[in-house]
């Protein structure tokens, strides 16, 4: 007889109305992990301005997101992800870890470059900061268009050409995608709204990657509304003057 699954509840940051999902890439990351695991779970949005007594008791520190697994409370996004990967494992649940270590680090500096770009108010620095963001996106594009070791046929003398895989580590979403995609989505929304910047069409690997991701419910349905992201960055994004 199959072991009964413990109750799983993810507590995430609420949006501006105190109810819908707010802007938080860490919350979305864990939301995606649970969805991909195929486990039954609940998501509770927490209004950071009006925390309920239940939330205060469960997590006095108030750090979001946090996970209730049975009666255990888990905090820290990285540790929660490790815990879920260890507890919700094969044969009942899929393994989500990437096979290639490079998949876990590719594109991770994009968010830092984006933050520097969007927080800058000095027009004289704008071009260089934009170039820094473009360079980071180019590194990701190179990784996405380069064949993974398992895509290379060592017996063939022909050049393998451009990878056509859907995601960072292959044709299935992994933990690496759960980490990167929520941040890439924020970059797209915020840069377009506050800088009129869009990811260049020349970065075909990145565009293919995002297109494949938005076609997956686990990503598209866990994204906060664009308005929530724009609102979160309203005070962060500095006007050039």
Swiss-Prot record:
Record CDD domains: GST_C_CLIC1 (cd10300), GST_N_CLIC (cd03061)
Alphabetical keyword list: Acetylation, Cell membrane, Chloride, Chloride channel, Cytoplasm, Disulfide bond, Endoplasmic reticulum, Ion channel, Ion transport, Membrane, Nucleus, Oxidoreductase, Phosphoprotein, Transmembrane, Transmembrane helix, Transport, Voltage-gated channel
Signal peptide stretch: none
A GO cellular component entry from the record: endoplasmic reticulum
Residues modified to N6-acetyllysine: 13, 119, 131
Annotated localization: Nucleus; Nucleus membrane; Cytoplasm; Cell membrane
Chain positions with Phosphoserine modification: 121, 156, 211
Membrane topology category: Single-pass membrane protein
Single Gene Ontology MF annotation: chloride channel activity
InterPro entries, per the entry: CLIC, CLIC-1_C, CLIC_N, Glutathione-S-Trfase_C-like, Glutathione-S-Trfase_C_sf, Glutathione_S-Trfase, Thioredoxin-like_sf
Residues found modified as Phosphotyrosine: 233
Motif G-site in this chain: 24-27
Enzyme class name: oxidoreductase
Family matches, as Gene3D superfamilies: 1.20.1050.10, Glutaredoxin (3.40.30.10)
Modified residues (N-acetylalanine): 2
Oligomer and partners: Monomer. Homodimer (in vitro). Interacts with TRAPPC2. Dimerization requires a conformation change that leads to the exposure of a large hydrophobic surface. In vivo, this may lead to membrane insertion. Interacts with AKAP9.
UniProt record similarity statement: Belongs to the chloride channel CLIC family.
Descriptive protein name: Chloride intracellular channel protein 1
